[in-house]
């Protein structure tokens, strides 16, 4: 994954006196931004009118559908968000805009996490309202706490008082809070990203200071990551081998593994939206593979393999993942008929591969593992490989090259750049440590013959053949 976070550090600050002068962008002013904002806003209104999209509001019944807009409007909308952000910063002023982030960023996340964790969403009827006392009783928290949490949420258009200015007003949904009921996957996203990542991200500075101050390179050692400081050996929040072990084992009784189940579901939905099914079906000449045995490593609940098994009835597919993924495999999504050819085998892909197969498949697995770990995973295949066995890697291309970054809206770039912060906090590496599959497979074992190493759109396709 490539470099796309541009440093603003000057050559003088870096101790370089003969560095070439970098090109500078045109000055941005409040007046210029406001004028452009009006122009871009009118363009969006025109697009919505042309495609019969109702004017979005904060009413709970509102459910905007921007999917009807032409594909090019995705970038246009993010460019509009850039303008809105710039106007916000410039209207506040440099100092106040920084102060606002310092005061509000953590509170924004914490409030959303609290509302989600205690399920405020279902307490208030979509077409009704509730009092502070009724809400407090339903979520089993002191009313005093609820009266502090909800007003902050109001400022972010999450719930609202029925009567503005009345301290005793009843509370109702807005479109933002109602979305948490209409689309339950949003709850999973909040669980995974805020409840799961807030702790490690909040101590990233301490981890960098303790383990990497004055050093030139990261070590990729879990014990030196923020996650490791909290959850690894001697960690105050438990002892887990790594982030995935935590996902797999967190919780007790029926709750054990709930985070892993959420992760499986979120990945399934994300891949649906990104067209991952067609990418998998077109990644290989599956019909030409004949009666092949396919091992899908890190295959979660096996849902991705359903269209593959349906379209190519000669394939026998073995889904491998941690034990907590088996309930997803058994949830009825895969028919009994298909299960004659699609099975589940609990397996940790860092341990030696127990199955001899024709094709080993890694779908959207490697993008958040370090290069060192990827090499270990590949090496674990070797004991089972027969000459001619193939390894197919399909992965997300989350890096953005410098040329694309130069023209991409900053609001859109955030989705790519935030991955580096997350992986740095959880795994001790960044997506900037480019994952060149050819190099990684050769580092694992030079008996791999590289057949393909391609990038198309948001997907990377790699194929190697074992010549041992």
Curated annotation (Swiss-Prot):
Task: Report the function annotation for this chain.
Answer: O-methyltransferase; part of the gene cluster that mediates the biosynthesis of the lipopeptide antibiotics leucinostatins that show extensive biological activities, including antimalarial, antiviral, antibacterial, antifungal, and antitumor activities, as well as phytotoxic.
A Pfam match: Methyltransf_2
Q: GO molecular function terms here?
A: O-methyltransferase activity
- Keywords carried by this UniProt record: Methyltransferase, S-adenosyl-L-methionine, Transferase
Q: What is the enzyme's class at the highest EC level?
A: transferase
Protein name from the UniProt record: O-methyltransferase lcsG
Name the Gene Ontology biological process terms.
methylation; secondary metabolite biosynthetic process
KW Signal (keyword) present: no
Q: Ranges of Polar residues compositional bias?
A: 1-12
Q: Where is this region: Disordered?
A: 1-29
Protein source organism? Purpureocillium lilacinum (Paecilomyces lilacinus)
Q: What induces it?
A: Expression is positively regulated by the leucinostatins biosynthesis cluster-specific transcription regulator lcsF.
Instruction: Indicate which residues the UniProt annotation says bind S-adenosyl-L-methionine.
Output: 298-299, 321, 348-349, 363
Q: Which family does it belong to?
A: Belongs to the class I-like SAM-binding methyltransferase superfamily. Cation-independent O-methyltransferase family.
| Pathways per UniProt | Secondary metabolite biosynthesis
Name the EC number(s). Answer: 2.1.1.-
């Amino acid at each position: 994954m490539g470099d796309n976070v541009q440093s603003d550090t000057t050559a003088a600050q870096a101790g370089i006196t003969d560095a070439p002068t970098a090109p500078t962008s045109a000055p941005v002013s409040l007046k210029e931004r406001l004028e452009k904002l009006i122009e871009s806003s009118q363009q969006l209104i025109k697009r919505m009118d042309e495609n019969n999209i109702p004017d979005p509001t904060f009413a709970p019944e509102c459910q905007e559908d921007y999917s009807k807009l032409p594909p090019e409007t995705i970038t246009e909308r993010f460019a509009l968000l850039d303008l809105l952000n710039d106007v916000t910063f410039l209207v506040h002023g440099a100092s106040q805009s920084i102060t606002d982030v310092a005061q509000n960023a953590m509170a924004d996340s914490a409030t959303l996490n609290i509302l989600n964790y205690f399920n405020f969403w279902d307490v208030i009827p979509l077409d009704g309202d509730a009092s502070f006392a009724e809400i407090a009783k339903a979520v089993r928290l002191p009313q005093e706490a609820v009266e502090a949490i909800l007003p902050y949420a109001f400022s972010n258009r999450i719930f609202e008082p029925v009567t503005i200015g009345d301290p005793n007003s009843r509370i109702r949904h807005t479109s933002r809070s109602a979305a948490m009921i209409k689309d339950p996957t949003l709850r999973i996203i909040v669980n995974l990203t805020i409840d799961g990542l807030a702790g490690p991200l909040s101590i990233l500075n301490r981890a960098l200071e303790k383990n990497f101050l004055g050093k030139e390179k990261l070590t990729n050692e879990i014990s030196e990551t923020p996650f490791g400081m909290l959850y690894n050996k001697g960690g105050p929040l438990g002892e887990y081998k790594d982030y995935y072990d935590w996902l797999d084992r967190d919780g007790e009784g029926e709750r054990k593994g709930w985070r892993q189940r959420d992760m499986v579901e979120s990945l399934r939905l994300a891949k649906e939206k990104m067209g991952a099914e067609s990418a998998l079906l077109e990644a290989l000449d599956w019909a030409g593979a004949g009666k092949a045995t396919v091992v899908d490593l890190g295959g979660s609940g096996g849902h991705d393999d359903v269209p593959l098994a349906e379209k190519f009835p000669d394939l026998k597919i073995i889904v491998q993942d941690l034990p907590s993924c088996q309930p997803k495999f058994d949830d009825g999504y895969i028919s009994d008929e298909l299960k004659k050819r699609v099975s589940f085998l609990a397996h940790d892909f860092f341990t030696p591969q127990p199955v001899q197969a024709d094709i080993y498949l890694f779908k959207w697995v490697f993008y958040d593992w370090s290069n060192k770990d990827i090499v270990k995973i590949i090496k674990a295949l070797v004991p089972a490989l027969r000459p001619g066995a193939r390894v197919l890697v399909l992965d997300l291309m989350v890096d953005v090259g410098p040329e694309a970054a130069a023209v991409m809206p900053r609001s859109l770039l955030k989705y790519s750049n935030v991955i580096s912060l997350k992986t740095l906090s959880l795994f001790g590496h960044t997506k900037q440590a480019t994952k060149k599959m050819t190099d990684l497979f050769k580092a694992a074992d030079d008996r791999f013959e590289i057949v393909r190493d391609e990038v198309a759109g948001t997907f990377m396709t790699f194929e190697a053949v074992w010549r041992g």
